[in-house]
Swiss-Prot record:
The lineage of its organism: Bacteria, Pseudomonadati, Pseudomonadota, Gammaproteobacteria, Pseudomonadales. The keyword Acetylation does not apply. It is found in: Cytoplasm. GO terms for cellular component: cytoplasm. Belongs to the EF-Ts family. This is Elongation factor Ts. Associates with the EF-Tu.GDP complex and induces the exchange of GDP to GTP. It remains bound to the aminoacyl-tRNA.EF-Tu.GTP complex up to the GTP hydrolysis stage on the ribosome. Keywords: Cytoplasm, Elongation factor, Protein biosynthesis. The keyword Metal-binding does not apply. PROSITE patterns: EF_TS_1, EF_TS_2. Its main location: cytoplasm. Residues 82-85 are annotated as: Involved in Mg(2+) ion dislocation from EF-Tu. The gene is tsf. It comes from Pseudomonas aeruginosa (strain LESB58).
Amino acid sequence: MAEITAAMVKELRERTGLGMMECKKALTAAGGDIEKAIDDMRAAGAIKAAKKAGNIAAEGSIAVKIAADNKAAVIIEVNSQTDFLALQDDFKGFVAESLEKAFNEKLTDAAPLVEAREEARLALVAKTGENVNIRRLTRVEGDVVGAYLHGHRIGVVVNLKGGNPELAKDIAMHVAASNPQFLNASEVSEEAIAKEKEIFLALNADKIAGKPENIVENMVKGRISKFLAEASLVEQPFVKNPEVKVGDLAKQAGAEIVSFVRYEVGEGIEKAEVDFAAEVAAQVAATKQ
């Protein structure tokens, strides 16, 4: 068998856009023949998939799997370029298999899952013509773990000390609807408070102008108190019964909220702005590849 040199791997990588390990694997299978390796990779759809990798994937699905004893759960986000693909069976199957693997192997980070599912991902990209990425994963373990999935776009996992699965699911539903930023006020950083103060002062510059310093200080304190209540889960009015705060709801059931994880599809991903004509042209061009 021909020796696979670094120069050969480099050349194949430059010509195909694929990773070094994939190029080395392809060269080994092709007996060191670069042209054959390229043909094999093209036949497998790998090169097409690599070209799609630069496309922004900001749609997709959130998926959650919870243990039968409610002691553990895994939540993952898998992105696609369009919501249309997120609703198709091929994509759903990829997500389900990825979630199952993450849960069964007790993975706590997305990196090993991304590596393990790369071949299946490339096959899906080649078949659908869209970029697909496993973006993130969180595993939660605790006394009582509950989850709520709102369609395929928002997923929440809540960890309780005490209580029951129904309570955990109710609180998870609340988190999905109200999107708290923190568990309680003690988790709010000084940076977040300073930013909120800065925003308040900027938005109310006209109202504040000419007022005594102590009055302005009280106005700021009032806004910060409101911010902490709005942003903290335990201080929010429970969506099913606004007369009760979420923290009090948990206490009444003999429970304490330990943590929560909320995923929403595409949050934090900067979407490229493409006009309609350009999008249609791009789709037409894609059909000719």
